[in-house]
Amino acid sequence: ASLNENMYTFLIVGLDKVAYHTDTIMVGRFDVETHEINVVSIPRDTLMNITGSTKKINELFLRGMNNTDGDQDAKLQGGIDRMLEGITDILGFTPDVYAAVDLEAFVQLVDAIGGVDYDVPVDMHYSDPTQDLYINLDAGMQHLTGEQALAVMRFRSGYASADIGRIGTQQDFLMSIASQFLTLGSIPHLTEFIDIFTEYVETNMTTENLAFFARQFLLCKSEDIHFY
């Protein structure tokens, strides 16, 4: 349940449906009265106090899937449930809402809004055929497609601080998207956005919930959105 009627906590994970690792993990709080959003990134290599060989938080999702019987939907829910347990162990509370965002969904969501303008901080060149991952972006301001935006979110080999460097870029990139939405004062193609979300994203939010949070988000100011 929500801490109070105006405040909601949330968990967002980026889900790699090849290895089922969650290399992007963000927990936040949205106050719909003050319209302030605070988001904390949890590093993928955070160690957990759990039994077995799995120790990193980004492997919890797969562990939950493997320990769940049933069809793929049941296994995905098992992964989410195990992830929520791990987050609760770390933070002491269970987020009100969650969203496990498939990588393809992220591509489609960015394309649905017509791409995004972003100042890529470093040259990003990386290839890994085993993951079907090919990144080829030069540093500088540019208009990114969904595939290019995903490359920015996934790239980490070029940072001196590896995943911590990637987290900083992820936060900066998401802030850039948020600022562009708020400058427009609307979310282009909101219906399409929600359709993609409901089809590709594992979440406990209803369509009505998504529309509510979208409306509330548009009442925020950029300076009231904080990443840590």
Where are these predicted regions, by residue range?
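Non-catalytic, solvent-exposed segments at the cell envelope interface
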Residues: 1-228
